[in-house]
């Protein structure tokens, strides 16, 4: 009985439809990170809000009133811009439109790492790699029928068996042929996500600006972004680093052997991004990259509200 008396009661949040849910610092902190607030600061704010509620003896609070407290606390602790961004995300969530992020970039630029962190911060459960889509398509379409599909993005030029004009870059021609087949699968996944209302991140080298139909990329809730690593030495180091973290991947020598092709593909993707007005972000720091992407997503989603 003594334990029961000493146990602190949680705060219940009353929703508009009458349902209640317990106040959770973890859930609120995750939502605050969407506003571009750092992880540590988000948890600090969530803790301070809980302390405000419990110090006043509040055991139940309406969602609307709680949102006012959250807004004012963010404004006090971080600033009005972040507070306004949080309020915008609440409005977006009520719209119930799926958010789909298309994250492209050359091999080794950090797409998977950034996609995982974005998924965590935005509460997105579905992350699809375009390599997985390519693998499914390889199972269906034979090498004889689709030779480019059965090469890697940076070795697809080896499947060229007809002369090409000398002014063309065969590595890019091969990559384009390879990517355009995978884009068919990407669009199928995109369409399904939109119909079923699934928040999703699709990441991979096959996200090429200009290749995915405008009927998708013109939607405010479909957000294409390209990542790149500017320094070639830094790019090369990343292959050695990920070989340590993920030993099941190809041997690092495989990537280094075709490093020139990987860099050419990166330059091509950045040029395509410039042509089609797609944001291209230099991926140097995970924290800075994620914050920039969240800022881009927020600006784009303003069109929904």
Question: What is the meaning of each model-derived region?
Answer:
Residues 24-43:
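Short, surface-exposed, low-complexity cationic segments
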Residues 124-140:
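Short beta-strand-centered segment that lines the nucleotide-binding/catalytic pocket of NTP-utilizing
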Residues 125, 195-202, 221-223:
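Loop/turn-to-beta-strand initiation segments
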């Amino acid at each position: 009985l003594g334990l029961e008396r000493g146990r602190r009661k949680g705060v219940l949040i009353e929703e508009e439809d009458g349902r209640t849910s317990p106040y959770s610092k973890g859930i609120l902190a995750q939502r605050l990170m969407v506003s571009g607030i750092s992880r540590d600061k988000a948890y600090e704010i969530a803790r301070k809000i809980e302390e405000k509620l419990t110090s006043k003896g509040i055991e139940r609070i309406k969602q609307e009133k709680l949102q006012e407290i959250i807004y004012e606390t963010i404004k006090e602790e971080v600033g009005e811009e972040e507070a306004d961004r949080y309020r915008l995300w609440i409005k977006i969530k009520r719209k119930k439109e799926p958010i789909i992020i298309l994250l492209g970039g050359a091999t080794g630029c950090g797409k998977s790492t950034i996609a995982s962190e974005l998924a965590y911060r935005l509460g997105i459960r579905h992350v699809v790699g375009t390599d997985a889509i390519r693998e499914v398509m390889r199972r269906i379409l034979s090498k004889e029928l689709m030779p480019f599909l059965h090469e890697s993005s940076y070795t697809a030029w080896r499947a060229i068996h007809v002369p090409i004009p000398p002014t063309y870059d065969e590595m890019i021609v091969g990559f384009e042929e390879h990517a355009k087949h995978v884009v068919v699968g990407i669009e199928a996944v995109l369409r399904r996500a939109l119909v079923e209302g699934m928040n999703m991140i699709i990441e991979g080298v096959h996200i090429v600006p200009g290749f995915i139909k405008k009927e998708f990329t013109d939607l405010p809730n479909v957000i294409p972004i390209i990542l790149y690593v500017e320094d070639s030495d830094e790019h090369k180091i990343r292959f050695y680093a990920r070989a340590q973290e993920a030993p099941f991947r190809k041997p690092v020598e495989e990537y280094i052997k075709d490093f020139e092709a990987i860099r050419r593909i990166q330059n091509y993707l950045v040029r395509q991004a410039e042509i089609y007005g797609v944001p291209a972000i230099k991926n140097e720091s995970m924290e800075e990259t994620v914050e920039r992407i969240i800022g881009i997503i927020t600006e784009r989603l303003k069109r929904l509200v």
